[in-house]
């Protein structure tokens, strides 16, 4: 038995368009006045007037989430708040998303913010996620966006200090809907069409093979020119054959003559229009004594990839509040979600979809992927797998046929989740009330992964995994709030709280490989011998308790001072951790005479100290599972060979402490021109001290490393939020809104440690490197002299450096959005354009497709004179003239006038033109070469993130069909247009999902654009 390591990532969200508001001057879209009654929800789930806040917070109303049409809260918040960076893993149904607020704050821990729903912390974990496998979900996707009343993003340390070691990455505070006075019923239905928004283009001129000649089962597409063939394959009728399930026969090819290019047909085998139905029903009621909100929803999505790609989420919610008497109020918030999905294999994965699809030669037809192989003697092999590397299916293919990946492999996830929050509020004094809140968040996830016999690679003999993950968090929260009068001009609100939390994750399951019965689907461990069975289990738990106090001073209703302090104890470190904060807001216009130019102004400053708790159990030296990996996504499990565990070579540290983040923030919120223009400015800088690392120690200690508080990081940045009321009248309103965020991150100190691997491969990875931004791209570089010029070989080609180093930065220079919304009579509209500039990405797919001769640039041609051809050489040192004389029509040919036309291109690296052809791209110039620097690409983008239109039908129409509350219809488009220089898929992607490693593309599944049509009835 082995102990399976779980990757647990606490993930998160952002902010929405037509409902955005920066705390301060009440700058919600469509608002042109200072609403002194506007409230925001604080880190502990209570409310506070936005005027009195001295730190940055962004707010979105629930309708802004729903109008986006996204399945998940995270995705719905994209583009709506400054310095809130959200990256979707892929376009797969239910795929998770990474959220980062004001840069990265830890190396070994999670950079995802804390999620608080109705005052209790909940999980947004994403278990799994690596360079291969399937894209994982974020557990925040279990929430129905239609149930949400508002979302607040607390960015800085001062805003979130009461959460101590869970607050370094900010806090997302979600408030769900409550019942309202009277009775109302709402039903909405949405139909959506999803399409691939960006694809790799494949060349269709040259066929399978090498050296300009067709070669059966060859990996590459460096073969002959397809158009110059004779038109029909020559078949050996007496040879081996493959008979597809539909009866189509494929014989042994003696000579390739077929001129057909199958790129379009193979593409259509993979992609379709994805379809989604989303239905929501909610009931709201309320009176003076009680209120109730109940909802049911069903999200049913079929992905853009044909086959087993789907996602279905069914939710139910009940929120209830009862005033028992004038002192006691009780309530219950309860949510249930059932999420079932099928995912498609991706990434560095011989069984992955894009790897097999994109590498397929343009002259190979992928249509018939399953059937029976017959030897020349007529001996059959059933359930044979036909692909371009095994065109007769005589053995497991090197790479899966996409049809096999889509239809034969199974990767299911079945999640059941409950979130319960009973709460009681007792007013024990006219100026004091006590809130008692219990939270319980529990989920189970059963994942089944099945590779039938004849899948590619290590799965050739079949494998099956049944994986059960159970996660829960229980919290008990007591809050006492009081109001005090300290004089005629000074008011004080006090809060004292205690919070206990217990979190645990339990994982149990097993794998079976090398199936005994090979010709049947066997989802059972019995179909494997004992030595090929691999059970696993793991358990982790974390306890913490925290006491805190908050003092809010209000001086003359214009100066607002908040002081907080929290003391926390946790099972992951020894001593208590103290996190103080202070914030000050001053309404400048209270002391100035208002003018037409300046309607409102508030200055704010805040500082705070929060932390990141060390990972569980590193205070002790543990035993770990034995295994080994080449660094390219494979893994050798020692438990299969008699060596399951060993004492870790990394020594525990009983003195380990939380990582400490100290942050200072300065800002201003202003309204100009009679409240028509609202602006928010924030500058911040923070320092993270004592980030946890495994630091090398002398071998004489018996260990190679020890956990220590050894690293320092820092962030600094600027945020601008804007809202402009362009037109305001009874029938027509028009508003311009937007935000801009810039963050600069630096790994200041690693205490002499080598660059820390975060994610990726042996050749290219994302790392923490001292003196560079967190997540910097690391890999092989070109050799250069002291002046920076390339060092060339004798033929004029660049050479590889013997040293690896930083080759790119996945972090953007800035990110922002600009929106326009408004209404004309019953018509409402919203347009949101978002941009991300200066970020780089490793285009691993692009590099490998160069190696395979698939990229269009590898099929380009050039013509030179015979004299020039005698002096131009390829990477082997062979002249162009010599290659043409060899007569391979896919390499170079002699024209009637004596000139020579060749496949490839010419490039001058500094010593004259050289010939870039197969021999360059399959060595140093391709994706399997040692120089990753050449595949670092600009991944900047600008997109139409969202376009929505809705129309409320005339009341007479709705009354005629007995819908008194009204009927509205709407349209939403997502990612309708994308402008980017990045080659291949939408650069809003990441190979390793929500991990700390960023900027990696290696056969990632593509992104989507969507068209949604909605109708809503209010009864």
Regions found by a protein language model. Give the residues of each.
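A surface-exposed, glycine/aromatic-enriched loop/edge motif typical of exported proteins
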Residues: 200-246, 337-391, 500-520, 601-635, ...
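C-terminal, active-site-flanking charged/polar segments
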Residues: 173, 178-182, 186, 193-195, ...
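Outer-membrane beta-barrel proteins
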Residues: 127-131, 135-178, 197-205, 210, ...
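Glycine-rich phosphate/pyrophosphate-binding loops
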Residues: 83, 824-844
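Extracytoplasmic gating/loop element in the C-terminal half of outer-membrane beta-barrel translocons
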Residues: 458, 570, 838-963, 967-968
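Extracellular/periplasmic, surface-exposed regions of secreted and cell-surface proteins
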Residues: 23, 112, 277, 319-328, ...
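Short, small/polar-rich motifs associated with maturation and membrane association
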Residues: 1-317, 329-331, 419, 510, ...
